[in-house]
């Protein structure tokens, strides 16, 4: 592969074919491309605008080079992040509820733009985020839940970490995380940081062999189901792509004040989640339930979103016991108990 020719193509705003993008991504991730050229390619892709074929090619390369585990019929709730509002880690909380009814392979990382990433909040709850593949399979078998830390399961990504940090801008790698689950999760609720990216990412997801993935962008600009207004979504299945607009009132609830969902740290997020599980924070509980409702719809466990909300309302009653089971199997229960005490006031 001639990297300089690829760069010229991108500078001329020509899209790469899937196989070109895949081979390019493999070369970059393996560390075979000089950093100065990696920087140029990532910036050229961003300036041109990443195409569907490029996202699919890069995603396939990342999947191939990842440490893989087999979790049949798993669901993931990973989103792109990057909304900048710093809301509570609702996708992680939803993953805990979902593990009551389905295997969950939660792919995630530390915070990039927010105050708390999924890895950060799980650590705050006492979870051991470094889980080797054999242990991961054991945890899924016993608890229906495992966290797959992106930095651990995509070790070759260290070869581009310095370039990404130095550039300090969003690159194609920022939007690949949710599409590169090491367990090859066939079901997903995927938050998207920009409404403009819904169409592109849904078309990319359609090429990546999901059974069903629902991509969401919520008002006022979050990569979650909206707590205050409309959620714009793309439902991607083997049958094609369906566009849906959902309002928070469609769940049968009133809008949730966004300021009640903001967190200052991973511990703050952990406390809010546990308070919701204890029945002491109605606003966060509602936020968790509406996101869980859409994930349940992705799993075809419910016929519509209102039914999903009612199911989630039932599941949240068992959520603290489930969280305790998850931490007991792979973490520090004393740390969780400390969070529970702080949440009980």
Curated annotation (Swiss-Prot):
UniProt pathway: Amino-acid biosynthesis; L-tryptophan biosynthesis; L-tryptophan from chorismate: step 2/5
Binding site for 5-phospho-alpha-D-ribose 1-diphosphate: 77-79, 82-83, 87, 89-92, 106-114, 118
Mutation effect (residue 164 to A): Strong decrease of the affinity for anthranilate, although only a moderate 7-fold decrease in catalytic efficiency
Protein name: Anthranilate phosphoribosyltransferase
Entry cofactors: Mg(2+)
Family: Belongs to the anthranilate phosphoribosyltransferase family.
Domain of life from the UniProt record: Archaea
Keywords for this protein: Amino-acid biosynthesis, Aromatic amino acid biosynthesis, Glycosyltransferase, Magnesium, Metal-binding, Transferase, Tryptophan biosynthesis
Assembly: Homodimer.
List of residues binding anthranilate 2: 164
Positions with a binding annotation for Mg(2+) 2: 223-224
EC number of this enzyme: 2.4.2.18
NCBIfam families named in the record: trpD
Cofactor remark from the record: Binds 2 magnesium ions per monomer.
GO terms, molecular function: anthranilate phosphoribosyltransferase activity; magnesium ion binding
Reported impact of residue 178 to A: 300-fold decrease of the affinity for anthranilate, whereas catalytic efficiency remains nearly unchanged
